[in-house]
Amino acid sequence: MKTLLLTLVMVTIMCLDLGYTLTCYKSLSGTVVCKPHETICYRRLIPATHGNAIIDRGCSTSCPGGNRPVCCSTDLCNK
């Protein structure tokens, strides 16, 4: 009986979604914890009018368009 109970507990633990959330760098500084449906960290360059590009970073549900986007799916991978 103890073996059956232990087996059920182990199966339950393995099947649970433990609510992992991704952490990405954000645009200006620091980090942001992504919403559960945001599974991509991104970094992209946004051209500016006077030649200086702006680096945009954050969380997304898909890889955004733009100039030279870099997309990844592990914590803090968009440095």
Curated annotation (Swiss-Prot):
SUPFAM superfamilies in the record: Snake toxin-like
Gene3D superfamilies linked to this entry: CD59
Annotated signal sequence range: 1-21
Disulfide bond sites: C24-C41, C34-C59, C63-C71, C72-C77
Keyword entries, A-Z: Acetylcholine receptor inhibiting toxin, Disulfide bond, Ion channel impairing toxin, Neurotoxin, Postsynaptic neurotoxin, Secreted, Signal, Toxin
Stored InterPro entries: Snake_3FTx, Snake_toxin-like_sf, Toxin_cobra-type
GO-annotated molecular function: acetylcholine receptor inhibitor activity; ion channel regulator activity; toxin activity
Tissue: Expressed by the venom gland.
Any one Gene Ontology cellular component term annotated for this protein: extracellular region
Recorded superkingdom: Eukaryota
UniProt subcellular location: Secreted
Function description: Binds with high affinity to muscle nicotinic acetylcholine receptor (nAChR) and hinders acetylcholine binding to the receptor, thereby impairing neuromuscular transmission. Competes with the binding of alpha-bungarotoxin on muscle AChR (from Torpedo) with an IC(50) of 0.18 uM. Causes muscle paralysis, spasms and increased respiration.
UniProt family annotation: Belongs to the three-finger toxin family. Short-chain subfamily. Type III alpha-neurotoxin sub-subfamily.
Protein name (database record): Short neurotoxin 6
